[in-house]
């Protein structure tokens, strides 16, 4: 007898039929508008909350790249926050800021809520 399982693996923001809706982005109707609004709100939060002086305090120079990935789960909560950077301190700061993101309307595929992965590159120029 065949086994039926549900694929619960996170989907990419660009591959779901309905993207997660950041608070304040409900007014936009198209997927592209909602992606842009989502990205704008995330970027604004990072600009406001990320401690940009941290790199200088650590004696880092030049351009520092931090790659953050998180999942907006089926309930619209931010989970599985992970960052990658040469600096442990910058990685921790990026993860801290990503966890500040508010709950939102979850992404959907075929009308059903799904987990959606979002990747965010942060560039800190010192």
Question: PLM features: what roles do these ranges have?
Answer:
Residues 1-126:
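Charge-biased low-complexity segments
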